[in-house]
Amino acid sequence: MKKRRKVTSNLDEKIHLGYHKDSSEENAAVECGQVTYTQAPERPTPEAAQRCQELPPSPDQRKLLSSLQYNKNLLKYLNDDRQKQPSFCDLLIIVEGKEFSAHKVVVAVGSSYFHACLSKNPSTDVVTLDHVTHSVFQHLLEFLYTSEFFVYKYEIPLVLEAAKFLDIIDAVKLLNNENVAAFQAELTEKSSPEETLNELTGRLSSSHQCKFCSRHFCYKKSLENHLAKTHRSLLLGKKHGLKMLERSFSTRRSKRNRKCPVKFEDTSDDEQESGDGSDNLHQESSEKERSDRNDSEDPGSEYNAEDEELEEEVSDEDSDTEQSDKDNDAEEEPEAGDSAGSIHEGLAPVIIQNSNKKILQCPKCDKTFDRIGKYESHTRVHTGEKPFECDICHQRYSTKSNLTVHRKKHSNEVEFHRKEHKCPYCNKLHASKKTLAKHVKRFHPENAQEFISIKKTKSESWKCDICKKSFTRRPHLEEHMILHSQDKPFKCTYCEEHFKSRFARLKHQEKFHLGPFPCDICGRQFNDTGNLKRHIECTHGGKRKWTCFICGKSVRERTTLKEHLRIHSGEKPHLCSICGQSFRHGSSYRLHLRVHHDDKRYECDECGKTFIRHDHLTKHKKIHSGEKAHQCEECGKCFGRRDHLTVHYKSVHLGEKVWQKYKATFHQCDVCKKIFKGKSSLEMHFRTHSGEKPYKCQICNQSFRIKKTLTKHLVIHSDARPFNCQHCNATFKRKDKLKYHIDHVHGIKSPDDSLSTSEEKLMSLPMEYSSDDKIFQAETKQYLDQPKVYQSEAKTMLQNVSAEVCVPVTLVPVQMPDTSSDLVPHTTTLPTSSHEMLPPQPQSTDYPRAADLAFLEKYTLTPQPANIVHPVRPEQMLDPREPSYLGTLLGLDSTAAVQNMCSSEHRS
């Protein structure tokens, strides 16, 4: 082979980048499994490459390259990843307490069950399986990652059932094919049909065995049904017995179609020698079976000697095979209208063509049938014909099935059933539930639907031997039996707690993990979804069908009406064990308990105030928003709350004495016996005795007894001056300062009124004076009685004050002569270290100097003791931290020269 040079990697780069393929590159040849290339030409220039890129690529330039091992490598990597820590797994599957790590995308692709769960809740990280064992699930998880099963033969049915439950389609197909192949191989190994029958019979439980044919049944009820329907005649030969035995392991087949498969037919020499006799016997048996089928389908029958004619009703245990019975009937019975048979004269059916099917209608009672055999059996109800006779007591019946039931009374081997089933409408006793159902449908048709619904809900097919509770399905009974054991197989996915039932686990999760559940309409929260649903139905929707017979009020629930009637009766059954207060409703009692426990769970976002109830918070928020949505139709006045509007309308416009309906509650102070209307007012008052000041300023650490006082105090630390004077340009931080300015500077309010107001406040303030303060108290009282200029008593009082105490001063009006134009000098005996003199400031031009002096001449500085509760208004006190306090108080400009009143000397 001629050696050729290989092309460099430029060729590959050209293919990847999409270069134009020239003829020189097509010289590549495959020789002996190796790809070789001829010498490539020189690399094209950039201009040529750009022209080639502008040309549209042709389809033959593209190549399909695939890796056969990539899929397997991907699954292998994912399988290895889930078995190591840490991993990229994002799902935890818990089966019988054992945890399996998996990838969501893998289980969602392979299982429709997981796909539905993860699609519904994409954020789910934990899934718990209750109906699958951990060993079986381990096989299925291995299959999802490796597409292979490595199981024992006996495990195949269990894995198949779990695969159907999890809806793993590929696993179901694979296991079904394996199961069928194994079953066919097992059948081919058998030498004869008898061995096959023996093998299949051995698989059945040996707990219940038929004494006639030695058949085995798993349940006693199946044996009873077998005895009642099979051994009505013992004249059938070996073939019939073989056919009846084969019936026991046929799955979901019709009870009316019991043909034996061809492979199981008995072809022994004895039957072959019988010749025509065997054929006659076979023909007789076939006719007898057909007659039995027709008889069993008769809707009218008698079940006792009293000649009560009943209609047939399919029992609960036959409900599973009802559809298959119809299919088999279509194969064996002639369709309606094919043959009239031996129908009595005058009872010829009326044929009705309905949807490509003929229906037979009885001319006597207008009942319809789709099979001629059923109609023939029905005609015996009208003719009175009873062709089936008991060979023991010669009692005759119109159908073979009723004769079979009757023969159970004469059988010694079968336990005789007493008439323990009582009709709820006529109190008649019946031997079985089936005959009772026929009786109700025949003689109480108006109550038939009610009886059937009760029968389905209270079926005794599966009954617990411990508590005698009945269930309609076997899995329900099996799950119920867990309650009588110590097992707790149901684990909570959020915690480590286990439960005996799924319902108990669900209630636990709703109460402790999934709540609270808020109402979208009113915002109220509930611990579980049941209470939320009940709240929505009762509060926000539904009809008010319960009406109070006293006041006519309508409510949605009966329990609500019962609680409403307590208003008229005065009953209050809910008693608080802490304070002894009684309540009419349980909800009011539970809300009251929050008061004792200080459970204020609803907080205002604006001011931080907390409330016990959500509706209280909603009403409080209207204070911040200023919303007044409730307007009076008479006067147009608006209110923030509806109850306030109601009280206003009744009291103002209707003239009702609304407040007389409510008993006033008063709270008395235990110390001073003072009475307050509100409990909060009493609490604030009691702080005057205890000295408690719970509200502290975070800036200056000053404490206050009332929160409102702290709020006003905080304005001092800010630069905001929100209160403006309407008469001048003066601004104030507090509203009371603005009021004082208007009253005293602009003279809108007379000094006498202001003085009287000050006197009232001074006398109303609760004060406690020490022995040192009694002198000042007497002087104050004397001044209020006869306002005049203070004499030297004030100076004498000031001499007793400690030098280390800063003496507060206040402005007191005095009588000055009109001719005097200079201020009377006053000096104090305070040390200079307490307050320093402010530096001189330029005089303001907004107010004339003469006006300033004339205004100041009306006041003098009167010192007061420092260790008393100030008997004057707070706005009258000078703040040493604010040099322009006096100017602000009088409405002067901040630049006006104001001398500090706490100087080292007080000139007199």
UniProtKB/Swiss-Prot annotation:
Q: Which GO terms describe its molecular function?
A: DNA binding; zinc ion binding
Give the top-rank taxon of the lineage listed in the UniProt record for this protein. Answer: Eukaryota
- Protein name as it appears in the record: Zinc finger and BTB domain-containing protein 41
Residue ranges of the region described as Disordered: 38-59, 252-344
Say yes or no: keyword Methyltransferase present.
no
Q: Record's Gene Ontology CC terms? A: nucleus
Q: Which residues form a coiled coil?
A: none
Asked if the keyword NAD belongs to this entry, the reply reads no
PROSITE patterns xref list = BTB (PS50097), ZINC_FINGER_C2H2_1 (PS00028), ZINC_FINGER_C2H2_2 (PS50157)
Q: Which gene encodes it?
A: Zbtb41
Q: What species is given as this protein's source?
A: Mus musculus (Mouse)
**Domain called BTB: residue spans:** 89-153
